[in-house]
């Protein structure tokens, strides 16, 4: 199985874009554990990293990237350029979208 190269730039050094398949997305929405949230709220008073939320955000981003990658593969792409994240939080729900442009590249 061919791997999908994902970059945040509009071009890939040493490659040229031969085909553009269009925008691809990966969306993940997760709710926070209410019991964990109560404990984490105490940390906001004294400061410091909130490890539970950091882990949740990391896992949510990785899942979004995986879904975007699968959509690009389904279109026949071997790369995604101009990859970005968008995220939002509402009450105890975190949502992350990974998006970019699916392309076919070849070495110059």
Swiss-Prot record:
It holds the Pfam family YbjQ_1. InterPro entries: UPF0145_dom_sf, UPF0145_YbjQ-like. It comes from the Bacteria. Belongs to the UPF0145 family. This is UPF0145 protein YjfJ. The lineage of its organism: Bacteria, Bacillati, Bacillota, Bacilli, Lactobacillales. The gene is yjfJ.
């Amino acid at each position: 199985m061919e791997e999908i190269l994902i970059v945040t730039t509009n071009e890939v050094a040493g490659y040229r874009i031969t085909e553009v398949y269009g925008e691809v997305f990966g969306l993940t929405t997760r709710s926070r554990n209410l019991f964990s949230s109560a404990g984490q709220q105490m940390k906001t008073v004294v400061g410091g990293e909130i490890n539970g939320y950091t882990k949740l955000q990391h896992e949510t981003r990785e899942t979004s990237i995986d879904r975007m990658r699968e959509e690009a593969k389904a279109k026949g792409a071997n790369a995604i350029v101009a990859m970005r994240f968008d995220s939002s939080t509402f009450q105890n729900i975190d949502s992350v979208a990974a998006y970019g442009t699916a392309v076919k590249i070849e070495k110059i």
